Regions:
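Primarily single-stranded nucleic-acid-binding OB-fold modules
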Residues: 341-364, 373-378, 388-393, 400-499
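Polybasic, low-complexity association/targeting segments
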Residues: 1-35
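Domain-scale recognition of functional cores that engage charged ligands
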Residues: 8-10, 29-32, 39-84, 89-372, ...
Length: 499
């Protein structure tokens, strides 16, 4: 099946032959659907703290930071913005010249509201000899759209989302990258320093670094802190091999194997290399202007406070187990694991070994928002490989759509996860966990793609906040919808929250 040439290609990527064979086997066997117990809800896996409790959690977080702990804000930022502009690419290629769809009309009717308006106007002047208003008056709408998308214009069709102008301010417009630097200063700084880590695609790395270098000093002065900003790329060793519909390796025209990025689950490797006590994770496009940041900052501190409060208790209990727990202590620890960490033993023997195993693992607290029809992974009580039940974030692809009961759970779930996580990644002795050990490898999924018109099967690794964190202790906290403002299309920037 694999030639000498294949083995060389695999070795260059840092992948073993066993991994490739295991991936090709996964195409044949597929991945099992998850066994669900219930959708999580308030009082069943989701905490909804009142004002007094929120204050306690914020205080707990600030006290924790004051101990000189190392906090890092981790931002997956490798996504290209191309999908944001799908409708505008379609307009440029359409066989009509004036805005026709509702989307196109909205874009051009509100064009002055975009934070990139001035930059686009300047590039139109340069390339077309006319500004946006004059081009529109001439009916030359396509020139405006093309100058936004194409390389000789703003190149927004190719740039990473993190470098597009999102929000207007008196002193100019800001990109999501800049908004994340500001957030880092506001809730993730300790010892007068904010550590921010961006994962960036190889092709955009130099540009991203240059833009960060250009802006970081401004915010460091503004907030009176120092920044330590680091970058990484998805590792080539996390790419997965593609297969033909008959599960044989898909090959490029030159006979080489085709590899594809393994999805955001690959970032567990990047996360594993971060030296931190606590790591905040939030997507690059989920940012708001300064006027709306206080709510985000408050809730970030609340979920971090929940995390360090639970972690402190777990560490205390692990030390008791080390010293030899009495029956009364074992009962107390068992109650903590079942009530606070929402882990149900399901008939397994709840002894010291079981409790240690459930406590001595990475921990995450995830913000969840009420379902308002935004697509996203949901919080569920799910069966683990060992037969116990605990909390997970599930995507629809992990659920058997033929199981009516499960589909009902999924569609009637009250909350979803907007990728808003705070993670504790060291054990009670202060040593870092090896995060890849806590991945549930059976939670990848297979999708259908094509290359040069040929159908292929692609293998996605267990998602970063799904199967890659399957064996972590997980707790959910309800956060307000105002803390979640993703930008999936360019017109989302016209929503009030981004103005």
């Amino acid at each position: 099946m694999l030639s000498q040439q294949d083995l060389q290609q695999i070795a260059q990527k840092g992948i073993s032959q066993e991994q490739i064979e295991s991936q090709l086997n996964e195409f044949k066997t597929g991945f099992p659907f998850l066994k669900l117990e219930a959708a999580a809800g308030i009082g069943r896996g989701i905490i909804a703290p009142d004002a007094a409790e929120r204050k306690q959690y914020e205080d707990a977080w600030n006290a924790y930071k004051a101990e000189g702990k190392r906090v890092v804000k981790f931002v997956p930022a490798s996504g290209a913005a191309s999908r944001m502009f799908k409708n505008m690419f379609a307009f440029v290629d359409a066989d009509y010249d004036v805005p026709t769809t509702d989307f196109e009309k909205k874009y051009f009717d509100s064009i002055e509201k975009f934070a990139f308006y001035d930059a686009l106007d300047a590039i139109c002047q340069k390339n077309e000899g006319k500004g946006i208003k004059a081009l529109i008056a001439d009916g030359n709408y396509k020139a405006v759209a093309a100058n936004m998308l194409k390389a000789e214009g703003l190149n927004y069709g190719q740039l990473p989302k993190g470098l597009l102008l999102f929000h207007k301010y008196e002193d100019g417009a800001r990109t999501p990258m800049e908004e994340h630097l500001v957030e880092g200063a506001l809730y993730a700084a300790s010892n007068g320093e904010a550590h921010v880590h961006f994962t960036v695609s190889h092709e955009h790395m130099e540009l991203f670094k240059a833009k960060v270098a250009e802006k970081a000093d401004t915010f460091a002065k503004k907030y009176g802190i120092k920044y330590d900003i680091t970058f990484s790329e998805q590792k080539p060793s996390t790419d997965t091999v593609a297969a033909n519909p008959d599960n044989t390796p898909f090959r490029n025209d030159d006979g080489s194997l085709l590899f594809r990025p393994g999805g955001h689950g690959a970032l567990i490797e990047n996360l594993n290399e971060i030296d931190a006590d606590v790591i905040f994770i939030k997507n690059i496009d989920n940012v708001v202007p300064d006027r709306l940041k206080p709510e985000t900052v408050e809730w970030k501190q609340v979920i971090a406070g929940v995390l360090v409060t639970l972690q402190k208790k777990a560490f205390e209990y692990l030390r008791i187990l080390d010293a030899g727990a009495t029956d009364a202590q074992l009962a107390e620890i068992a109650e903590f694991v079942s009530k606070c960490l929402c882990t149900d033993a399901k008939g397994k023997k709840v002894d010291a070994a079981y409790l240690r195993e459930k406590l001595n693992r990475p921990m995450r607290v995830c913000g969840v928002v009420k379902n308002v029809g935004e697509p996203g992974g949901g919080p569920f009580l799910t069966y683990n490989q060992d037969g116990t039940v605990s909390l997970q974030i599930l995507e629809s692809s992990q659920i058997d759509t033929n199981n009516e009961e499960y589909m009902k759970m999924f569609t009637q779930g009250t909350h979803f996860n907007p990728v808003d996580l705070v993670c504790a990644v060291k054990n009670y002795k202060g040593e870092p966990f090896n995060l890849p050990e806590f991945v549930d490898k059976t939670t990848g999924f297979i999708s259908s793609k094509s290359k040069a018109g040929k159908e292929l099967k692609a293998l996605e690794l267990p998602g970063l906040w799904n199967g890659a964190m399957s064996n972590w202790s997980t707790v959910f906290v309800e956060v307000p919808l105002g803390t979640f403002n993703p930008v999936k299309t360019v017109n989302d920037l016209l929503r009030d929250q981004h103005q």
